[in-house]
Amino acid sequence: IEVRANELRILAEAETPPFPIEENSKTKEDLRLKYRYLDLRRPDLQRNIMTRSRVATMVRQFLADEGFLEIETPTLIKSTPEGARDYLVPSRVHPGEFYALPQSPQLLKQLLMCSGMDRYFQLARCYRDEDLRADRQPEFTQIDMELSFVDVEDVLEVNERLLKKLFKEICNFDIQTPILRMTWREAMDRFGSDKPDMRFGMELKNVSDVVKDCEFVVFKSALENGGSVRGINANGQAGMPRKKIDALVEYAKGFGAKGLAYLAIHEDGS
């Protein structure tokens, strides 16, 4: 259809957007955050927000079916000793006094248990004034729950069923329950981290017994001071060039290590 126009009137002139509104944008984060209202139009972020909404709805429904009550606890509370510093809000009515924003509703949910609310939950907003890291931010939401007259297995079991349902409904992925468990000591011994990635194959091996009679001063000093000697098996890397080894040494120093000791053992045992 062809239309002959006698007049064209521009009601709102569109400016060129600062970055493309498209999925997997390569735009720098600071520019995306400056124009957040445009960034949130991107399909991947739209999906993230919708997924979060679905998760919240499923969590509420699951826990309600399990007999939990959703109870909102106050945001302006008394400061209590926690793992980080409190965010403080000055009181207008009581000059010189402050409220604290909750790092977690720990004391409040304990009061609920004392009050006879046997199963409580909320999607709680938490605030922690601490140094920013990749896995830390000033405010976040956590699934907060408390149960009375239960043991550890009861708590783990209900959370495992919740996770199983979420992964199935959201990701169409079946997770095996009971979920693999390990102690903090086992995680540190095997992976050197309290939140290990189980896909990582080069686990730490304790070789203290092997090197206990070694005169190498680094090993000897560690063992004499009650420490241990641990290593990883970098299979197939016996021929690694010295330049790459030196780069790994410097990389390790960046995480607080004093250096790296290494042994090259070939297939023939040499």
Label every model-predicted segment.
Residues 1-270:
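Class II aminoacyl-tRNA synthetase catalytic cores and aaRS-like
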